[in-house]
């Protein structure tokens, strides 16, 4: 029996990432009819609302919780979803938290790219393989740009929003791997078990997104 099957059909468990996406996600879900409010700042990681349990997770863990049925649905960036490799249902592009995953190098740097630093080894490997670049990939956790500035790597692959951090550190984008926005993801078993709750939520979110000004 999966975790999704142990809960009552009328109760939803949602996985949302801590940080920049959380507030926009809660606001959008509330507009879609769920009785949610922004959780108070505390050490609590699980928040209870009428008919809904909200789990605050690290970005990378949202697809895992949804795929394994601990959460019925969640919201996560497309970049995280692709890197996870998890096979979850992705019904709605929510069109916020827009950014791009880019290949970045110090301005004026010359020579071949032999080592690449990144938090996204899966996406980076696919990109390099497709172009026949046999570079070593170094998996890093934070301050990715520093790898290019210190010589740890010849280039880095990281998310870019405005590009201001790159300009401030004499870095430039060489190529864009893909563009990313926040996505609604749903556990496939939960979609059947909680159809009466998840289908209306999906349709309401689609309508809200379509009616947002471009």
Swiss-Prot record:
Q: Which CDD domains match?
A: PBP2_HisGs
* SUPFAM superfamilies tied to this protein: Periplasmic binding protein-like II
Q: Which InterPro entries match?
A: ATP_PRibTrfase_cat, ATP_PRibTrfase_CS, ATP_PRibTrfase_HisG, ATP_PRibTrfase_HisG_short
Q: Under which EC number(s) is this enzyme classified?
A: 2.4.2.17
Q: Where in the cell is it found?
A: Cytoplasm
Q: What sort of enzyme, by top EC class, is this?
A: transferase
Q: Which GO terms describe its biological process?
A: L-histidine biosynthetic process
| GO MF annotation list | ATP binding; ATP phosphoribosyltransferase activity
Residue ranges crossing the lipid bilayer per the database entry: none
Alphabetical list of Gene3D superfamilies matching this protein: Periplasmic binding protein-like II
- Pathway(s) it belongs to: Amino-acid biosynthesis; L-histidine biosynthesis; L-histidine from 5-phospho-alpha-D-ribose 1-diphosphate: step 1/9
> Quick one: a GO cellular component term?
cytoplasm
Keyword vocabulary terms for this entry: Amino-acid biosynthesis, ATP-binding, Cytoplasm, Glycosyltransferase, Histidine biosynthesis, Nucleotide-binding, Transferase
Q: Which reaction does it catalyse?
A: 1-(5-phospho-beta-D-ribosyl)-ATP + diphosphate = 5-phospho-alpha-D-ribose 1-diphosphate + ATP
Q: What does this protein do?
A: Catalyzes the condensation of ATP and 5-phosphoribose 1-diphosphate to form N'-(5'-phosphoribosyl)-ATP (PR-ATP). Has a crucial role in the pathway because the rate of histidine biosynthesis seems to be controlled primarily by regulation of HisG enzymatic activity.
The UniProt family comment states:
Belongs to the ATP phosphoribosyltransferase family. Short subfamily.
The domain section of the record reads: Lacks the C-terminal regulatory region which is replaced by HisZ.
Task: State how it assembles.
Answer: Heteromultimer composed of HisG and HisZ subunits.
Q: What PANTHER family is this protein classified in?
A: ATP PHOSPHORIBOSYLTRANSFERASE (PTHR21403:SF8), ATP PHOSPHORIBOSYLTRANSFERASE ATP-PRTASE (PTHR21403)
Q: What is this protein called?
A: ATP phosphoribosyltransferase
The species this protein belongs to is: Deinococcus deserti (strain DSM 17065 / CIP 109153 / LMG 22923 / VCD115)
Please spell out the taxonomic lineage of the organism that makes this protein. Answer: Bacteria, Thermotogati, Deinococcota, Deinococci, Deinococcales
The encoding gene: hisG
């Amino acid at each position: 029996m999966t975790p999704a099957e142990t809960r009552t059909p009328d109760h939803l468990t949602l996985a949302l990432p801590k940080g920049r996406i959380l507030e926009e996600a809660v606001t959008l879900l509330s507009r879609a009819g769920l009785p949610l409010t922004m959780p108070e700042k505390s050490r609590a990681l699980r928040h209870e609302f009428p008919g809904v349990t909200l789990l605050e997770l690290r970005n990378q863990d949202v697809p895992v919780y949804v795929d394994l049925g601990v959460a019925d649905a969640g919201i996560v960036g497309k970049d995280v979803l692709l890197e996870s490799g998890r096979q979850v249902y992705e019904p709605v592009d929510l069109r916020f938290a827009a950014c791009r995953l880019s290949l970045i190098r110090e301005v004026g740097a010359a020579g071949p790219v032999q080592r690449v630093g990144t938090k996204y080894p899966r996406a980076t490997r696919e990109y390099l393989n497709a172009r026949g670049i046999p570079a070593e990939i170094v998996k890093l956790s934070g301050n990715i740009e520093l790898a290019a500035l210190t010589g740890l790597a010849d280039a880095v692959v990281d998310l870019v929003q405005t590009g201001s951090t790159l300009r401030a550190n004499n870095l430039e984008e060489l190529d864009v791997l893909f563009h990313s926005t926040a996505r609604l993801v749903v556990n496939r078993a939960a979609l059947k078990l909680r159809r009466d709750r998840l289908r209306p939520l999906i349709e309401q979110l689609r309508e809200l997104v379509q009616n947002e000004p471009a």
